[in-house]
């Protein structure tokens, strides 16, 4: 509802009314503000106070729109006339009230009466215009500015407005379809006597000369306002005419207010007022719309205001009680805290004194304990020394008495009882130490000998017990003996004896199993230049299984486990692994290639399948890589000799075979080969890479760079110098045309040139592979030796330069051959080809043949040459061809007209062919060739213009004269104009 949403503005209006000249709230509801001690009650107090002030100021009704006009007279007997118009909105319904008041003051008496009250209700829900107007006009009554006592508190704030007098008692008013007008005329006369200032409602005329007719009024209290509303309801007259029935509520149900309504952050003034007035609004809804009656709302708001005031008083009283309780609690808390602080300080002093006493006693106790422990240690040492001396004296005396009594000796139980052998070992170790200290005393010589004898026999007895326990897998007994021997003399013999007695090192069946596996060559697979041998995987898997089992036993038995594991690993490499590798390699002793591959595979397999897994055991004191190198040292020492011998035999046999085959080729026979034999070149590359890979593994560190250089130089020698150079020279000789031969097969020569191009292409490809090999397989492994690195680089580029020089020679020879073929193709050119009279727009037969030949040369070069080599070659071909054409056309007479057009047709075709070469030099040369045709096309007087304006300026005068003389209409006088 819109009037409920304006509750905040009504609170501000109430604050303004409390200023001087406005309406002050009743003094009975004013309570001093206190600082709340309870957050719950404080939160409730704020909304209740706001609602109380709002209801006091406006009764819950929104700010009305009031138009008032006052007519005052300076003479006391004159009456005051006031017309008040008030507009109120409830939701979408608008209420408009118009009231005519008149009053007259005389002395201490005040006469006031209400003339006419018009109520207009406007609602969008009304379907038809309904209006009533009822009025009672008193012609003797005069307007007054004083309000009627029956008016609501809202209506007391009126200003004067013009009145509308009607002479008829019953007047019907027709309004808009959404407006209902009800005019109620009441006449009320109120007499107020102002005798004392304490009167509840006092109207006193002003004595000011400027405004004597105005009367100052004071707001009534809440009780007086309630009484006025009740009187107004009782005095309400029956309307004279009412077209729409209005039903008033029988009883206003007061809403009980509690503090729970105002709890929480979601409380809203608007929602509260809407809930408060919803029942009244529903009751006033008739069949034809809403009929507003303000009296029930005023009564409801007054009751609510009283309840809110009472609730506010209760909350304030509760706040005061809580504040007092908090103050009392704070006082008690501080008093108890002071008492506890004093008690704590007293207790702290007692504990401090107690701690000091405990520290003093503890220090003394520790001192006494140290002294007692020192005395006890000295006592134990003295007793031990005394016991050792007694045992030593016993051994010394027993030895002497045995000699005197014929070998009859009597010893202590510790020397004779076998169950105390471990205790005896501890005693003998101490006796041996004492014997060393007193060896210079001659009286204890016999005791020292007896101690040594007992020590030897004792160690042998413990070793025998250990071996018997190992045979029956009694790990507890083994551990007891090993621990005793470790404390007796370190236990090295015990660990060594255990390793020697392992089944894998002396059992005949184990030896035969390893030997049979090494001789089983069916498990070896050869894949190209690589081998896959599963024998090593089977063998090393079995070893790792045995090592894992023995490690478990060693951890459970021996104290010094690292030493025992080191002995086990060393024995494995020195005996079992070495024997297996020797058996495998002995089968390949007659085949150098397989021997080298097997050695390399065995080395890598041993490292990968055995050394690397054993690294995970973390055995201290054993260098596994050194053990690996010790096994393969005998093969590494003579590796490079075997490698070079194998490579030389392989390279030599292939090169000799290929060279012998090429020697049988005829000069002009057809060739099916495409350059170098790819099988041979790839064999060189693959075998060299394999050899370099083997050298990384099988070469000793100090000679690795030299071995790589040896292998690389060997490959360069056979691949470049002995094979590639030989093949290149062989194919360079083929395209040469003998001068004595008058009939040469052009197709055969073209094929030989094509073969040369393919050889050049093959050489370029193999050179690229060798350069990649150098970067990947050679250079990274020789960087530690700058001398070897420099030697390898120089040798590589020397061989490449030699090949390039030879290739350049071959390409120059091929160009010469091509030009010779072009000249040979131009020979059939007829002398009258350019003296014809009929023009058919076709090239000559010779021109077509030459173009076809040059195009074939260009295609061969494009397929087989690459990069700058191709561009330089075709550019040279184009320039040489243009030179041949220049000399060729110097020999022919050119007819003017049709003959010149025929010449231009041939020259245009030559020029178009030259565009493929994509060379500016070639384009300029053929442009010059085409310009020659203009000398035959223009008139003689234009020779100078043609020569100076085109490419002919680059041609010598002698050549120009030659071409001019070839005109069919040549006259010598033309030469004077040049």
Curated annotation (Swiss-Prot):
Residues 1-87, 122-246 are annotated as: Disordered. Residues 1-11, 122-142 have a biased composition (Polar residues). Residues 36-52, 62-86, 143-245 have a biased composition (Low complexity). Keywords: Coiled coil, Exocytosis, Protein transport, Transport. InterPro entries: Sec10-like (IPR009976), Sec10_HB (IPR048627), Sec10_N (IPR048625). Residues 303-325 form a coiled coil. Belongs to the SEC10 family. This is Exocyst complex component 5. The gene is exoc5.
